[in-house]
Amino acid sequence: MTQDDNLIGYCGLYCGDCHGFSGKIPNLARDLRKELRKMRYDKFAEFISTFSFGKDFRNYEECYKVLGAMVKFRCRKGCRNGGGSPFCKIRICAQKKGIEGCWLCDEFESCKKMDFLIPVHGDAYVKNLRAIKRKGKDAFLQGKRLWYSKPKE
C-alpha cells in the first residue's frame, strides 16, 4: 500500500494502518461467518454446548453477532477525507486552530481530547506525534508507525 500523508490523522495515528481502513479484519469476519453458515456450525455449537467440555459454545450466537459487527466496521476514507467520527474532538480542534495536525500544537502531550484513544491505542498517538514533530511527515511515513503502544505505568 502506498504511504499517503493524507492518511496521517490529526491525532498522529495512520489511518492506513487501521483494520477498518485495510478491511482485513472485516473481510476475515465476513468469510468466517460465511463458513460457519455453510457448515451449520450453530447446530454443532448447540450440541457440543450440552457437554461440560463444550460449555463455552453456549455463547456461540453472541460470538456470531460480534463477527457481524466486525464485518460492518469499515472506513475507506480516513479522517481527513470524511471518514471516522464526525464528532471527533481532535479533528474539530485542529481544524479550528488551522493546523495540519496535533504535532503542530504545543499542548498535545497533555491534551485531554486525546484520552479516548488510550484504551485502544495506549500511548501510540503521542509517540507518533513526537516522531512527526521531530522528523517530519515523510520520515514518519517511511519509518515505524505505532498503532498500539503500552503506556508506561
Which sequence ranges carry the predicted segments?
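Cysteine-centered metal-binding/redox modules
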Residues: 1-153
